[in-house]
């Protein structure tokens, strides 16, 4: 904006605006003017497009018309929500000076910066989703990543070793805003993400980061947090903390610790796996028919958010898992009485964050009081539950009787939205406030008496006393009787059918009332701030209580789901393997109108890979996904949709299921498929669960078959992972004859004429046929095309019965075989240009080639 270069050419107000705007050049500036927030120049044009509001002009400054857009201050939250959802940040500039005493423009300053990752206002947040601010750092040794939920104070860092792990972490956390260094090399990793913020290199400096974090936590070093030896993670965390301080412009007492997330503590799932399993988001980008949608009947928003974190970070520590299982078992006959009480607790976690940031509104304090009022009942109900983990949660929950009594005394039953509206502090809490209020409230009686007195004295039946915000108190007389107004009645306003007057007595009373109202409101604001000061020392205990209540909500919810949906408690075993009796897909069984066909599964060190064949739509993908989802549920401590489950250690879950062209990156379906396959072959171990669906279908038949065979061979013989390998290549059903630990299973169907019935039952052995033409007919492919396809199928089968199978041998199909050597004569011929040879040279070449052969 060139306007900043010549400030003196502008009006004093525009000079003030331009100076403030220069401090925030890359974000929108909401500049408070009276009852509106105004935007000027390029900001006005952008806001007009983003918010669909009118673009106007405000006079001229420096001889040029000023583009302007404005929004009413009382509707600012709605507009902020729209901007934040589009990844925009906004600096809020307020009037802090008194217009009555200001000689030039009223003093203004930016009081807060609203960004997608640092919002805490409930109007701007998704209630049942975490809203994270993250920072990413990269050097030659790997990545550093830090994520903060400012609405709870939860602060985490990690050090992903490679690009795939970093991509998985970004998808798991899905930050609303992502900070990155100006020299960040892997832009392809983050391009297209919302809320990207480029930051200067010095903000990622390690010594500054340590200093910032120690200052925040009041510590001398970071050893106690277990992050001292995570330099890359600390670089990211330091930048993130600096950014939060810059935007919030206040202390952050609710951010009291930082935790290191280590890969070995949880089951690792890459980005493709999270997407394919539809954990919290379906493949279309929505939330319907996901695992979370089925599993989440939590009664508090903070419980819902915790459940989703559990689903994305399954735990490998069986002690934690068994403890959760026992708690769920203990709560199974209690959820009907506990859930209605817990529902009343609400979102205590986010209320506490707003308290810490000193942005809590009166209704937040009322909700906090209501949450405290539930604790005695909840603690009494939990006292009867015979479970050590439950009793620990009950203890952590606390009771906060004194704080509850304070809020009951101090805050009215149903407070207004904002403290500036007045009427927040309860009568009887503060003597001086009551006196000022009595004076202000006494106005009604006085005005009634004045109106009766003047009406009777003057004999004017249309006379009445009123008040409006612009003209203050007045006496109104109809136009027809206005000529009877006494001489000391001073005309204040003329209306179409009436005249309004002021008298010295009324003016004197108005000053008195307005003074008392102003004094009452100022005192009320002071008392409101003092309430924050009284609550703040208890913040750590309150946050621990909110966390315990959220965990209790998750566990009670899992108990209710287990009971309602007929889930069983899985057993953890030491040896690798998964044994499932009557397993079901948790989502599909809820969507189907007919009963879901349950199926068994047996994977063990002696039976590591299942080759799954059967028709399209026969249920292969459902069977594979349900296995992964049952494993995932077991490793968050939940009961699972099966009659019985025994499950061994799992370190990673991989899925290579379905793919689409990645047009943005210029990658074909086959390239996407091969990239995911390469990731599995490089990173899977004998404790990994691998789902491979239709590998190799994106290329020619023999290429695809060769790749599928080699991948299956590597997974079964070299990696020894627990693998479900679905395929249409019937040649792969020979693998069990050639390799140990591989078995065939199939999903069957019955064909009758042109119709097909899918049995959805898993049986041992290979499928007898594909039923592809029957499925095509079912999909509505024209009959003449199906008829022609049957003819062609018979021709191909008669020409080449199982031709491919005769060419595939496990001992020869490994992709790792060295290429055949090329003969010297062939190499010489390939490099020869016959058109450039003379007859003599050609003759010499013939002799040379003869010698090479």
Swiss-Prot record:
Function: This protein is involved in the repair of mismatches in DNA. It is possible that it carries out the mismatch recognition step. This protein has a weak ATPase activity.
Listed NCBIfam families: mutS1, PRK05399.1
Residues engaged in binding ATP: 614-621
Database matches in CDD domains: ABC_MutS1
Biological process annotations from GO: mismatch repair
GO cellular component term of the entry, any: cytosol
Keyword annotations: ATP-binding, DNA damage, DNA repair, DNA-binding, Nucleotide-binding
InterPro entries tied to this protein: DNA_mismatch_repair_MutS (IPR005748), DNA_mismatch_repair_MutS-lik_N (IPR007695), DNA_mismatch_repair_MutS/MSH (IPR017261), DNA_mismatch_repair_MutS_C (IPR000432), DNA_mismatch_repair_MutS_clamp (IPR007861), DNA_mismatch_repair_MutS_core (IPR007696), DNA_mismatch_repair_MutS_N (IPR016151), DNA_mismatch_repair_MutS_sf (IPR036187)
A Pfam family reported for this protein in Swiss-Prot or TrEMBL: MutS_II
Official protein name in the record: DNA mismatch repair protein MutS
GO MF, one example: damaged DNA binding
Family statement: Belongs to the DNA mismatch repair MutS family.
Gene3D superfamilies per the UniProt record, alphabetical: 1.10.1420.10, 6.10.140.430, DNA repair protein MutS, domain I, MutS, connector domain, P-loop containing nucleotide triphosphate hydrolases
């Amino acid at each position: 904006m060139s306007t900043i270069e010549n400030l003196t050419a502008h009006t004093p107000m525009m000079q003030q605006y331009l100076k403030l705007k220069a401090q925030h050049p890359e974000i929108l500036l909401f500049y408070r003017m009276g009852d509106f927030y105004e935007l000027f120049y390029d900001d006005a044009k952008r806001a007009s497009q983003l918010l669909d509001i009118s673009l106007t002009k405000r006079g001229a400054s420096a001889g040029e018309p000023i583009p302007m857009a404005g929004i009413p201050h009382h509707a600012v939250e709605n507009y902020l929500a729209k901007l934040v959802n589009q990844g925009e940040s906004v600096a809020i500039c307020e009037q802090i000076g008194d217009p009555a005493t200001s000689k030039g423009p009223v003093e203004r300053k930016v009081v807060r910066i609203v960004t997608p990752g640092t919002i805490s206002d409930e109007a701007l947040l998704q209630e049942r989703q975490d809203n994270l601010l993250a920072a990413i750092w990269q050097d030659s040794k790997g990545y550093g990543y830090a994520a903060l939920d400012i609405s709870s104070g939860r602060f985490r860092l990690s050090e992903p070793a490679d690009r795939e792990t970093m991509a998985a972490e970004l998808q798991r956390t899905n930050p609303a805003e992502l900070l990155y260094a100006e020299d960040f090399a892997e832009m392809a990793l983050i391009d297209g993400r919302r809320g990207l913020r480029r930051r200067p290199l010095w903000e990622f400096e390690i010594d500054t980061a340590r200093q910032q974090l120690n200052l925040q936590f009041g510590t001398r070093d970071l050893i106690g947090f277990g992050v001292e030896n995570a330099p890359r993670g600390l670089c990211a965390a330091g930048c993130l903390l600096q950014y939060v301080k810059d935007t919030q412009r206040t202390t952050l007492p609710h951010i009291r610790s930082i935790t290191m997330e280590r890969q070995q503590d949880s089951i690792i799932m890459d980005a493709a796996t999270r997407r394919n399993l539809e954990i919290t988001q379906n493949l279309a980008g929505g939330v319907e028919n996901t695992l979370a949608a089925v599993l989440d009947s939590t009664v508090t928003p903070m419980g819902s958010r915790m459940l989703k974190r559990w689903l994305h970070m399954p735990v490998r520590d069986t002690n934690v898992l068994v403890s959760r299982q026992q708690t769920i078992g203990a709560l199974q006959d209690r959820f009907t009485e506990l859930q209605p009480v817990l529902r009343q607790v609400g979102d205590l976690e986010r209320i506490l964050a707003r308290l810490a940031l000193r942005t809590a509104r009166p209704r937040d304090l009322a909700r906090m009081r209501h949450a405290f009022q539930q604790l005695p009942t909840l603690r009494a109900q939990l006292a009867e539950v015979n479970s050590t983990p439950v009793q620990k949660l009950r203890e952590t929950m606390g009771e906060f009787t004194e704080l509850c009594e304070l809020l009951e005394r101090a805050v009215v039953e149903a407070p207004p939205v904002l403290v500036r509206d007045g009427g927040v502090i309860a009568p009887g809490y503060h003597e001086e406030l009551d006196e000022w209020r009595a004076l202000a409230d006494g106005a009604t009686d006085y005005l009634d008496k004045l109106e009766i007195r003047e009406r009777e004295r003057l004999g004017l039946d249309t006379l009445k006393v009123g008040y409006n915000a612009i003209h203050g108190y007045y006496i109104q007389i109809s136009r027809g009787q206005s000529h009877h107004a006494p001489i000391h009645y001073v005309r204040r306003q003329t209306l179409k059918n009436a005249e309004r007057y002021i008298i010295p007595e009324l003016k004197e009373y108005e000053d008195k009332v307005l003074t008392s109202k102003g004094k009452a409101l100022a005192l009320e604001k002071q008392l409101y701030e003092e309430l924050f000061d009284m609550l703040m020392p208890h913040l750590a205990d309150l946050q621990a209580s909110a966390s315990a209540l959220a965990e209790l909500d998750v566990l009670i919810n899992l108990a209710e789901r287990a009971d309602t949906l007929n889930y069983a408690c899985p057993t953890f075993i030491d040896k690798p393997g998964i044994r499932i009796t009557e397993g079901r897909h948790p989502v599909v069984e809820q969507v189907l109108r007919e009963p879901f066909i349950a199926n068994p599964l047996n994977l063990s060190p002696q039976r590591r890979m299942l080759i799954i064949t059967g028709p399209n739509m026969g249920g292969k993908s459902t069977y594979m996904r349900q296995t992964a989802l049952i494993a995932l549920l077991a490793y968050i401590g939940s009961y699972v949709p099966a009659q019985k489950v025994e499950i061994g250690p799992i370190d990673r879950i991989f899925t290579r299921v379905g793919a689409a062209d990645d047009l943005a990156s210029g990658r074909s379906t086959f390239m996407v498929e091969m990239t995911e396959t390469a990731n599995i072959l490089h990173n899977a171990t004998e404790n990994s669960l691998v789902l491979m669906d239709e590998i190799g279908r994106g290329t020619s038949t023999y290429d695809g078959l060769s790749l599928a065979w080699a991948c299956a061979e590597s997974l079964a013989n070299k990696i020894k992972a627990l693998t479900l390998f679905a395929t249409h290549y019937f040649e792969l059903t020979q693998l069990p004859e050639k390799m140990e630990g591989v078995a065939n299973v199939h999903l069957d169907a019955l064909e009758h004429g042109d119709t097909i019935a899918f049995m959805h039952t898993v049986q041992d052995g290979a499928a007898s046929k594909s039923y592809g033409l029957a499925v095509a007919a079912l999909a509505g492919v024209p009959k003449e095309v199906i008829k022609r396809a049957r003819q062609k199928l018979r021709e191909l089968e008669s020409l080449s019965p199982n031709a491919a199978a005769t060419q595939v041998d496990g001992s020869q199909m490994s992709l790792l075989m060295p290429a055949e050597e090329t003969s010297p004569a062939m190499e010489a011929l390939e490099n020869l240009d016959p058109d450039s040879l003379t007859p003599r040279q050609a003759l010499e070449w013939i002799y040379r080639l003869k010698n090479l052969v």
